[in-house]
């Protein structure tokens, strides 16, 4: 028989607790089994003893009670100095075990994250350093290439800036001339409108005078009828006096009518000649405007041609720079043919660039010639303006003569009214000239279907942008 001593210690949840003791020790059930060293206890016996001791519920003479449900026990073996083996049984609740397992999982996850972050950041830093070194080497090479390219392009840009400044100054001169021409044309149009209005007013006045003469002729016929019907004693004396007065008045009236008709015909001829001159001036102005339009279109075509030449020259310069960069590298025996081909291509490109420069110079000369032609057209327009001013002066003189004739007609009508009141037997008859109202001509006004100032502004903006 084996001798063994066992001690069961059960700590219940209702026992008194010290204020500093943890709450986890309340659910610990300790079971000590002391086995002598001479006779080792087999494992099966130990398991049976553990099972039996789990069923025990004694603690220092306390009455038996059932252990709480959902408790997990753990057995710990240890050996004392007296070579006695002891087994300690610990009991935990499932909620405590779950909390500890979750705590352990959280600790492991945080440790794994820290490890990945430390080693991952180190690898990323190494990769970034490598990329930065590569980018620095590439940027140094690009910087050297760009410095060479900038040096070549700066000289070309200086030349093109000089050309652009010259073209801009020429375009500004063209703008000024075109603005002056438009202002002069607008002034001429206003003057022609005023002339037409004055001519129409004078024709209206002439029609009114003719109507008044017709009314006077009707009144004279009525007076004749009255004279014939009168049967007074002094008819003969009065007839003689009236005949004398009538003859005198008729002579004066005929003279005034002849003068009036002659002056009227002269005025009509002069106005017709002035209208013809104005029409010719308008035609010449239209021709000048058409020529200005053609010059404007030609200048636009030349600007587009220069833009295309500049683009082609830029492309050729880029090709030449590419060939020069290829030629500047180290040469081997296999690259000699390629080097010769590049030299020939670069020589042809230089020749084409020189040819394009010559073409641009020729186009600039053409633009200057067109500017000179526009200046000559401006001088011609000034001459036409002087001619129109002279015609306006003549028309004002004719208006004065017309006013003078009107005053004479007014005087004659007043004297005619006085004689009618005094005698009441005088009849006046006159044959009026046919009215020439249908001889009015329509003045063709010059018109322009475009705005040259805006066109020149567009061309200058294109030049500045290129």
Swiss-Prot record:
Keywords: Cardiomyopathy, Cell junction, Cell membrane, Coiled coil, Cytoplasm, Cytoskeleton, Disease variant, Membrane, Signal. Residues 1-23 are annotated as: Disordered. It is found in: Cytoplasm, Cytoskeleton; Cell membrane; Cytoplasm, Myofibril, Sarcomere, I band; Cytoplasm, Myofibril, Sarcomere, Z line. Its main location: cytoplasm. Residues 1-10 have a biased composition (Polar residues). Detected in heart, liver, skeletal muscle, placenta, small intestine, lung, prostate and testis. Expressed in arrector pili muscle (at protein level). Residues 96-142, 174-418 form a coiled coil. The keyword Coiled coil applies. One of its GO terms (cellular component) is RNA polymerase II, core complex. It is a peripheral membrane protein. The keyword ATP-binding does not apply. InterPro entries: Tuftelin_GRINL1A/MYZAP/CCD68. GO terms for biological process: intracellular signal transduction. Residues 1-20 form the signal peptide. Transmembrane segments: none annotated. Plays a role in cellular signaling via Rho-related GTP-binding proteins and subsequent activation of transcription factor SRF. Targets TJP1 to cell junctions. In cortical neurons, may play a role in glutaminergic signal transduction through interaction with the NMDA receptor subunit GRIN1. Interacts with DSP, MPRIP and TJP1/ZO1. Interaction with MPRIP inhibits the activation of transcription factor SRF. Interacts with GRIN1. Interacts with DYNLL1. Belongs to the MYZAP family. This is Myocardial zonula adherens protein. It comes from Homo sapiens (Human). The gene is MYZAP.
């Amino acid at each position: 028989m084996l001798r063994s001593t066992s001690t069961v210690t059960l700590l219940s949840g209702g026992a008194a607790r010290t204020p500093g003791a943890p709450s986890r020790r309340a659910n610990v059930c300790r079971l000590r089994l002391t086995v002598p060293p001479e006779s080792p206890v087999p494992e099966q016996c130990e398991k049976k003893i553990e099972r039996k001791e789990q069923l025990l519920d004694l603690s220092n003479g306390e009455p038996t009670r059932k252990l709480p449900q959902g408790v997990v026990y753990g057995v710990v073996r240890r050996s004392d100095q007296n070579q006695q083996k002891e087994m300690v049984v610990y009991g935990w609740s499932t909620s405590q075990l779950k909390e500890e397992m979750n705590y352990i999982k959280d600790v492991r996850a945080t440790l794994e994250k820290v490890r990945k972050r430390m080693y991952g950041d180190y690898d990323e830093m190494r990769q970034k350093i490598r990329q930065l070194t590569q980018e620095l080497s590439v940027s140094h090479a690009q910087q050297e290439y760009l410095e060479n390219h900038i040096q070549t392009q700066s000289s070309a840009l200086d030349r093109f800036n000089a050309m652009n400044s010259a073209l801009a100054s020429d375009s500004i001169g063209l703008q000024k001339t075109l603005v002056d021409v438009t202002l002069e044309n607008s002034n001429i149009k206003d003057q022609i409108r005023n002339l037409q209005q004055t001519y129409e007013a004078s024709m209206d006045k002439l029609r009114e005078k003719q109507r008044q003469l017709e009314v006077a002729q009707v009144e004279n016929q009525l007076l004749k009828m009255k004279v014939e019907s009168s049967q007074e004693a002094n008819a003969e004396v009065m007839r003689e006096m009236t005949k004398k007065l009538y003859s005198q008045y008729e002579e004066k009236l005929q003279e005034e009518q002849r003068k009036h008709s002659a002056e009227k015909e002269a005025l009509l001829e002069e106005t017709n000649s002035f209208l013809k001159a104005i029409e010719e001036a308008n035609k010449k102005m239209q021709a000048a405007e058409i020529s200005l339009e053609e010059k404007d279109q030609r200048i636009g075509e030349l600007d587009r041609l220069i833009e295309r030449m500049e683009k082609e020259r830029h492309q050729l310069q880029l090709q030449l720079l590419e060939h020069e960069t290829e030629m500047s590298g180290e040469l081997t025996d296999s690259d000699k043919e390629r080097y010769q081909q590049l030299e020939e291509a670069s020589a042809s490109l230089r020749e084409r660039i020189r040819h394009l420069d010559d073409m641009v110079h020729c186009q600039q000369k053409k633009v200057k010639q067109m500017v000179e032609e526009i200046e000559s057209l401006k001088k011609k327009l000034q001459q036409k303006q002087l001619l129109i001013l002279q015609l306006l002066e003549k028309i004002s003189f004719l208006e004065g003569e017309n006013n003078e004739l009107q005053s004479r007609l007014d005087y004659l009508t007043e004297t005619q009214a006085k004689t009618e009141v005094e005698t009441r037997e005088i009849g006046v008859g006159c044959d009026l000239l046919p009215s020439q109202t249908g001889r009015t001509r329509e003045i063709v006004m010059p018109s322009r279907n475009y705005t040259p100032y805006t066109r020149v502004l567009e061309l200058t903006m294109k030049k500045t942008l290129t």
